[in-house]
Swiss-Prot record:
Compositional bias per record (Basic and acidic residues), positions renumbered to this chain: 187-197
Membrane topology category: Single-pass membrane protein
Species of the source: Zygosaccharomyces rouxii (strain ATCC 2623 / CBS 732 / NBRC 1130 / NCYC 568 / NRRL Y-229)
Family, per entry: Belongs to the MPS2 family.
A single Gene Ontology CC term: nuclear membrane
Regions annotated as coiled coil: 127-243
Polar residues bias spans: 113-124
InterPro entries: Mps2
Name the UniProt record assigns to this protein: Monopolar spindle protein 2
Top-level taxon in the UniProt lineage: Eukaryota
Pfam name, any one: MPS2
Chain segments carrying region Disordered: 102-129, 187-206
Subcellular location: Nucleus membrane; Cytoplasm, Cytoskeleton, Microtubule organizing center, Spindle pole body
Length: 343
């Protein structure tokens, strides 16, 4: 026999109402087998022998899906599509394959004739609308919760990405520093060779001298970067960009240094250089003459990283008679660490 489009939907509605007790308009995948059993019960009513709605293979596939996707939500309007994907046959064709009589479906719950019971149909419409609205509100709330959960995951991933980016930048800076240090030591290790009769103390002095020269070169590089940054700020202030644009008329009237931004930068730079000169002079004066244990004992200012760099900068700058010797042991050590083989 031929079934119209509402026949399969009628069977689904009858079975769905038996499983979806809360009228949520969806069921979980774990309730899928129960829905299939309800459909078989509806189709078997009035029959002498129970009708087989699905084959054993189809039931096995649905049972496996229910176990693996236990809390997967199956909405009413998506059921037929999911059923077709699992069984490989449309829900309508499966109903027709049971050869159930249409009279059985009419007895189980065919919609009443609108012309005979208009009052009942009108009274049920508001309830149906309210139920649909309630289902939609529930579904929207569920989707909002899922969206909030996904937003939290995205925020966490963004924080992890920022941390990884910072670590990558730190590692890059460290790598560039080690690369500059290696190149500097290697260049000094390629200086003219000395006789093998030179003392070990001279080699130690050369090691310390090379180390201090590298520190001085790093300070010079930093100073150049700061000078370039100051120049850029001056250009921005002259063009009216930067922090000067944010000042109000009140600050222009009562702040005498407002319209003289470059002068403020120059004054700050002079104060900073004056402090460095004072500290360097004090260290140079109190350093005294070097003795045989000068490289094994540290002065009070050498215990501080900043004071040590400034002090050695002025002491090495004032000492222009340093002779360079071969730095073969340190060069060999760097080549072993970096995995460089000589050709």
């Amino acid at each position: 026999m031929d079934f119209d489009k509402s026949s399969s939907s009628l069977v689904l509605d009858l079975a769905w109402n038996q499983v979806d007790k809360k009228n949520q308009d969806f069921i979980y995948a774990k309730d899928f087998p129960a829905l299939i059993m309800s459909i078989e019960e509806i189709l078997s009513r009035g029959q002498q022998t129970p009708l087989a709605f699905l084959s054993n293979t189809g039931k096995s596939v649905i049972d496996t899906f229910a176990r693996e996707k236990e809390f997967f939500k199956i909405y009413r309007d998506e059921f037929k599509e999911i059923f077709h994907g699992l069984v490989g046959k449309t829900f309508k064709d499966t109903i027709e394959g049971t050869n159930v009589s249409r009279s059985v479906l009419d007895e189980q719950g065919q919609e009443p004739d609108v012309s005979t019971t208009p009052t009942r149909q009108q009274r049920s419409s508001p309830r149906k609308v309210n139920r649909l609205l309630k289902n939609l509100e529930t579904r929207v709330a569920s989707m909002k919760d899922e969206l909030k959960f996904k937003d939290e995951i995205l925020a966490e991933k963004d924080r992890e990405l920022i941390q990884l980016t910072r670590k990558l930048s730190d590692y890059k800076d460290k790598y560039e520093f080690v690369q500059r240090q290696f190149s500097f030591y290697k260049d000094h290790g390629e200086s003219p060779r000395r006789n093998s009769s030179e003392s070990e103390q001279l080699n130690l002095e050369q090691n310390a001298s090379t180390k201090h020269e590298f520190i001085i070169s790093e300070l010079k590089r930093k100073l150049q970067e700061q000078t370039l940054a100051i120049s850029n700020l001056k250009e921005q202030l002259q063009r009216g960009e930067g922090a000067g644009v944010l000042y109000t008329n009140y600050s222009k009237r009562y702040n005498p240094l407002h319209n003289d931004g470059p002068m403020v930068l120059v004054l700050a730079t002079l104060v900073f250089l004056t402090i460095i000169l004072l500290i360097g002079s004090m260290i140079w004066v109190t350093g005294g003459k070097d003795d045989s244990n000068s490289f094994s004992q540290y002065s009070w200012w050498e215990n501080n990283s900043l004071l040590s760099r400034i002090g050695w900068f002025f002491r090495d700058w004032s000492d222009t008679g340093v002779d360079y010797v071969n730095f073969e042991p340190s060069s060999d050590a760097y080549e072993r660490i970096m995995g460089i083989r000589r050709i």
